[in-house]
Amino acid sequence: MEQELQNLENEAKASLTAICASESLEEFRIKYLGRKGLFTTVMRQLGSAPAEDRPRLGQLANTIKAQLEEQFEEKRSSLSQQTSSSDTYQSLPDLTLPGRQPAAGNLHPVTQVMQEVCAIFEAMGFSVAEGPDVEQDYYNFEALNIPAHHPARDMHDTFYVSGSTLLRTHTSPMQARVMEKQDPPLRMIAPGKVYRCDSDITHTPMFHQVEGLLVDKNISFADLKGVLTLFLQKIFKQDLPVRFRPSFFPFTEPSAEVDIACVMCGGKGCRVCKKTGWLEILGAGMVDPEVFKMVGYDPEVYSGFAFGLGIERIAMLKYRIDDIRLFYENDQRFLSQF
């Protein structure tokens, strides 16, 4: 019986040492230390041992079982710590993996076109000048050869703030402001918001314009045509036919409306171009001598040209959009396309 107990002890210790997982540890407990385990079976057999050996064998059996139970608890504690450390390690982020790309919005289509227009003119040597949205009547009208009661003022549905203060109806006031402070030669564009009391599928009360001005000696209409033709080919990324039609603007003389071949039909004639094959895109002309006199330039020495274009108009043609109001309705289905 004593030898049987020692054999069982050696077998149990060897089995416990080899255990590496909690599942195997539970199987060990049931096999050796459970109610129906091997040690329980041996303890029940002590009754058949000689009476004089029973106390010694019982004490030996209890000692072996107590030692195994202590070693069992140590093993369980060790495995529990290993499992906890492993879980902690697995829960840590892998810093070697690439990070998630943050969600970011896109620039508004009007902003994209505005930046593209400015970049094209900057590449031609034009500087960018910005001015106030709330303007004085003098710079918005009088300095541009549009005095009080001039019939040309009827062309502008103006938002007046108070007295002679108004929301600018075009970015042309920056021409006068820049020329007052800078001697020729100069090349500048003035991008920004403008305001007119008008709202339909092709007009909004607030929209964006870019005004351009070039002043130097011996500037001719041919220079104007060359600059604008190059710009239109670059902004629409194709060699579009361009034509200049006589027109009238108070601050330029001669003046012209600039048309391009319809981008919808390629100049063949469609509903958008009203079967003409042409689309009006901007206005331009040679700076009127009266404007030069207002800012102290000598019109006998210097000449120049000016032009103005609507950013929304460019964007509508560039992206084939038929309603200007889509730009300002904040519809993500529309804006996410750009």
Curated annotation (Swiss-Prot):
Organism field: Desulfotalea psychrophila (strain LSv54 / DSM 12343)
HAMAP family (alphabetical): Phe_tRNA_synth_alpha1
Coiled coil: none
Stretches for region Disordered: 71-101
Protein name: Phenylalanine--tRNA ligase alpha subunit
PROSITE patterns (UniProt xref): AA_TRNA_LIGASE_II
GO molecular function annotations of the record: ATP binding; magnesium ion binding; phenylalanine-tRNA ligase activity; tRNA binding
One of the protein's GO biological processes: phenylalanyl-tRNA aminoacylation
Cofactor note: Binds 2 magnesium ions per tetramer.
Superkingdom classification of source: Bacteria
